[in-house]
Regions:
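Short, highly charged, low-complexity non-transmembrane loops/tails of multi-pass membrane proteins
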Residues: 7-8, 182-198
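Membrane-helix interfacial "entry" motifs
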Residues: 14-19, 58-70, 95, 99, ...
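Hydrophobic alpha-helical transmembrane segments in multi-pass integral membrane proteins
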Residues: 82-92, 139-154
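Structural signature of hydrophobic alpha-helical transmembrane segments
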Residues: 35-50, 96-108
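Short, Lys/Arg-rich, polar N-terminal cytosolic tail immediately upstream
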Residues: 1-17, 193-195
């Protein structure tokens, strides 16, 4: 004998709809931050650093909670980079010959320690993208010279590189959040799935 069975009503996963299209929000965000990299001379921020961390924001979830991963991991990576370049600068003061040897030593020691400590900090594991980007952005800012150069003190220049790498990274997280926020997402009420009869 056939029995009527009504399928259980299932609710759709809650979704949101953008008020401002995402593509337009991206363009608005770019226009918003361009002055920071164009109009301040040697004090202009390296916006390419910000763009990379902006991408990290979306890669790691595109929500406010990413601040708990990106900021500490990126900061730690940049910190290790500063330590490596400071060590390189110090070694270069008394190691004669090719200047590449102090760099080899500093990077070998620094990267070894940087990777080793990852096992003790979960945020460095879940945020490994930001962790290593912190290092790479610090090295890029330093070697490209994308920082103020109002002094010739080699150690101060390393610290300035660190400050600008961090500023660019923090700006990147902010514009990721800003980009999503200005779409003004609206929640869409979940709808029950259509019932079926067998």
């Amino acid at each position: 004998m056939a029995l009527d069975q009504t399928a259980e009503i299932q609710m759709e996963t809650a979704k949101t709809k953008e008020t401002i299209p995402f593509w337009l929000a991206v363009s608005i965000t770019v226009m918003f931050i361009l002055p920071l990299g164009l109009y301040f001379g040697q004090y202009s921020l390296p916006l390419w650093v910000a763009f990379i961390v902006w991408a990290e924001y979306f890669a790691l979830g595109a929500n406010l909670g990413t601040i708990k991963t990106i900021i500490p991991a990126y900061t730690a990576g940049a910190f290790w980079g500063v330590c490596m370049i400071l060590l390189y600068t110090w070694l270069a003061t008394f190691m004669t010959g090719a200047s590449v040897y102090p760099m080899y030593i500093a990077l070998f020691v620094g990267v070894s320690v940087m990777v080793y400590v990852m096992k003790y900090f979960k945020v460095f594991q879940t945020g490994s993208l930001a962790y290593f980007n912190g290092l790479s952005m610090l090295l890029a800012v330093y070697f490209v010279g994308a920082h103020p150069t109002f002094t010739t003190n080699a150690y101060v220049l390393v610290l300035l590189s660190g400050a600008y790498a961090l500023a660019g990274g923090y700006l990147g997280w902010f514009i990721g959040w800003f980009n999503v926020t200005i779409t003004f997402p609206r929640p869409i009420a979940p709808k029950p799935a259509a019932s079926t009869r067998v």
